Amino acid sequence: MNLEILLYENRKAKLLNILKIGINPFKKFVSTGEIEEELGLVQSREDLLNIIMNTFDKDENIILPIIGGVGTGKTHLYWSLKKRLHFYNTFYISLENVYRKFYYNMYSEYIEEMGGGEVLRSITNKLCAEWGATERKFGFFHIADIDKVRNSAFEKLKSNFDNKIALNDVINAITSHQLDPYKRVEAERWLLGELMDIRDLSHLNILYDLKRKSYAYTMLKIIIENSELRSVIFIDDFEKIVSLMKGDKKSEEIFDPSWLYGEEHIQSPETRSAQKALDKILDLQKIKGLRIIITLKSIDALEEIKSIIREKNNQLLATMKEPIILSNFLENDIFQFYKENMKAFLKNNNYLEFFEEFPDSYFPLNEKILKYIHTCSQGNPREIIKFFIKIFNEIIFSNNNFDNILAYYENQC
């Protein structure tokens, strides 16, 4: 046995010892919008990412559908996109969990994503300056004329908002935040989306907190349109809207209550909430510079959404781009995916020299097993990772001989 082979065998033995500690390189296999995904992109996903970014560079107010079945990596794509869009506020909402209090939840996610109070203070300072806060009243302290600033803001913004009461209260909160030292703390709490009691609201001379949909929408529009960064909202599980609007399919009855009361009066609360949520999402198109990504599991679901939008406002369909199809992994993708994640695993365990010395090795698996996994999983990323977890768990925890484990999976091919 020559020296190179001996070195390789020693390196393999050390890698197996690291695995035997009980660490599975693929232990996490379901990506969520709340937990950051660290896995890299394979080449076919890189190409899709470039298409999305080019689309964002060309257009501002768009709806971009992404179609992908269960386990194809839609949420993983969100994390990869978020890392690439350095000059965007990119935030995630799942309609599986959030379709009630939509604007409030969206605003909360947006504020958290952009960094909270510090960035918010920068935006409110910029707004007050544009509204005339730099012009000072005469007097010992040369303070700004708050009423004049508020009137100026209202005149500049009123044509862009239907709810003038909400607009007036939002302006009060922003100007109090910057120009009134006695109300600054409460105003910042209000702007950050905290729920407030009547006493605090009265102190600010404001009727409602941001749980009120018109208030949350007004704040969203003002903050997004005046942020230094462009904005992307990634709305996952969009077909939830379709399923809720359909409601439960019932068998045909001799008497249908809708004949007497009308369809709108027999809808379930969930159906009405879904319709309202869709209306709110469509209203987001009025926010200048907001790019919207929606994910669905099928083209059929997208066509149903288009049909609903067509009935509500046919012009909005012009803002909807052709869908991007998130297909399963190609065979080359699984090799790249496996190598990249094994490399990350070795780096985290201070054993990157294995990868550096043997860059073409797929140890502890091999090409034959990787091809078997791709075939059995039909290229579905989630199913691929489940296979990896299963095989690595056997390597780590099973009493079976390592060579016998590999031989078993090789014989499945």
Predicted regions and their residues:
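Charge-rich, solvent-exposed alpha-helical interaction surfaces
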Residues: 51, 126, 149-156, 169-173, ...
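Short, surface-exposed basic-aromatic patches at helix termini and helix-loop junctions that form
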Residues: 54-57, 80-88, 283-286, 310-316
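AAA+ P-loop NTPase catalytic core and its hallmark functional loops
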Residues: 31-38, 54, 61-65, 72, ...
